[in-house]
Amino acid sequence: MSKLNLSAVAFAAFATAAGAQAVDGPGPNLVIEVAGQANGTIVIDLLADVAPQHVAQITALATEGAYDNVVFHRVIDGFMAQTGDVQHGKAGGDLSMAGMGGSSKPDIPAEFTNDLSFQRGVVGMARAQDPNSANSQFFIMFAPGEFLDGQYTIVGNVVSGMEVVDAIKRGDGQNGEVSGTPDVMTKVTVQP
């Protein structure tokens, strides 16, 4: 899987928007414990009714512990924080390939919706150029990014811990790569 392909020009166009967190829906909820520059808990309401295949895969990976100790490898200020590379993104390992991998599970066909838009706190699935190549990586929006609508699958909304998302260490490398020690998802669980 290649890195999320987005124009660097578009990144600069978005400033961090203030806004309320989404209301918690029927779930399931993805609960992410974060350590590093950011410390705390992020709760994401997964939208099983919108993206059932993607939510099933995320839920399975979290239940298996695959997301535990995976870093936020790509973080672009005013845009998004990306994580979920369970193959190359484990803390303490060689992170030079972080963002290029996925899981041993099959890629998932796109589940686009016209009913939702990429806004602050929305969670989307990262993918390669093929819209049907999402696997394990996901990103959390710092600010609106409607240009992603119909291009990337929306899988959830942050319902608690947006202040933790806002504190995630920003990338300073090419295309938002985080140098030094990136923040890490120490434990990821699923709650009904």
Locate each region found by the language model.
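Sec-dependent N-terminal signal peptides
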Residues: 5-14
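Cyclophilin-like peptidyl-prolyl cis-trans isomerases
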Residues: 2-5, 18-192
